[in-house]
Amino acid sequence: MKTKILALSAISAACLMMMSTAMAEDAPAVVADPGPVTANVTLASEYRYRGIAQTNSKPAIQGGFDYAHESGFYVGNWNSSISWVSDTYQGANPVVSAPIEMDFYAGFKKEVTEGVTLDGGVLQYYYPTSNLPTTAGNPNTTEVYAAGTYSFATLKYSYSLSDLFGQLGSKGSSYVDLALNYDTGVEGIVLNAHVGYQKVAGSANPNSSYTDWKLGLTKDLGHGMNVAVAYIGTNADGTVAFYQSPTGQNLGRGTGLISFTKAF
């Protein structure tokens, strides 16, 4: 689950993803030497996606690969350690195992005029699981997305073609977000700001929709490396099972995060 939260790179030189990404979906990618194939690896204090904790306040390791053709076509894979699926069904017998998220995406991104770039594609979130209860929703999710970037601002819209991350009856959910990544011109520091709204469809999910936000800084360390810090929060209803930890804490509560990324 990307976005692209804590800015963690699932984005290549030609692919802005959400995916967001710990501080994922709206941070600038760390880009190594330009080329058709790039890779990235990230260590994060926590993985948050659309403001919701995916690792229950624990660190995450993440990484991915991207191929970008000069025509604008791109395809890629991004992966992260997670705990939210097994946490959601804690107490189930036998124990649910779902330690990893695997994202597969493809799309087309092109500068249509000076300073204006359009991007569109499809994203599959895949969660290899075992012992998932038969009554549980399938966490695997398919979304299509469209985005436009002007200068340092990106507006993106995502629409789910399946139920959203296991919430039954939520097909047709949508997420819209605005990300600002402003180069301060000071010592390789970029100011990151983000606000998004997750609309969860279906009458069975009346309290699942919420707003999330982020404010942070990314520092270019050179040699394809960066460090990012951010404060992330949401107004998600902590009584909703998908937003509640096994100990009853709100998984969307405000928190500070830090991540280190290396691009190849």
Q: In which residue ranges do the predicted regions lie?
A:
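Residues that define the transmembrane beta-barrel architecture of outer-membrane proteins
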Residues: S57-I61, A98-M102, N138-V144, T149-S151, ...
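Short glycine/proline- and aromatic-enriched beta-strand/turn motifs that initiate or cap beta-hairpins
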Residues: E25-W84, Y89, T255
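Repeated loop/turn-to-beta-strand initiation elements of outer-membrane beta-barrel proteins
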Residues: V37, S71-V75, E114-L118, F152-Y157, ...
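Cleavable N-terminal export/targeting peptides
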Residues: M1-P36
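Transmembrane beta-strands of outer-membrane beta-barrel pores
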Residues: L43-Y49, H69, N79-S83, Q124-P128, ...
